């Protein structure tokens, strides 16, 4: 493959990644913990869209439990978003040197 073909392919890959990123900005995933007591909705940009806390989970005598539930819900949302990114980028991820997460 000559250098011009390589540059053309690189530009095509960059354009595809930009389109996928634009699509991902519209995606939202939901992380859940405690059987639904805590839910966190995360945008494709990894920005938190919303947090739901069931009143049952809010016990001022057990704040560490609530903290653990929030952390678990966030981590669940991040894992789902990473999986979504991998699925959308697919083979482009390896061509672009991997994903930054």
Q: What is each residue range found by the language model?
A:
Residues 1-30, 79-101:
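Long amphipathic alpha-helical segments used for membrane anchoring, targeting, substrate engagement
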Residues 10, 46, 70:
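Residue-level signature of catalytic and energy-coupling elements of molecular machines
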Residues 26-57, 61:
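N-terminal intrinsically disordered, cationic/polar leader segments
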Residues 36-39, 50, 68, 72, ...:
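Alpha-helix boundary/capping detector
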Residues 52, 56-83:
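Active-site- and interface-proximal helix/loop "cap" or "latch" segments in soluble metabolic
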């Amino acid at each position: 493959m000559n250098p011009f073909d390589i540059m053309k392919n690189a530009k095509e890959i960059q354009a595809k990644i930009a389109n996928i990123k634009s699509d991902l900005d519209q995606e939202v995933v939901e992380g859940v913990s405690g059987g639904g007591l805590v839910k966190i909705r995360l945008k494709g940009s990894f920005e938190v869209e919303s947090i739901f806390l069931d009143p049952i989970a809010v016990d001022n005598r057990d704040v560490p439990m609530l903290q653990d539930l929030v952390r678990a819900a966030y981590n669940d949302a991040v894992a789902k978003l990473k999986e979504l990114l991998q699925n959308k980028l697919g083979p482009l991820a390896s061509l672009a040197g991997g994903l930054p997460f």
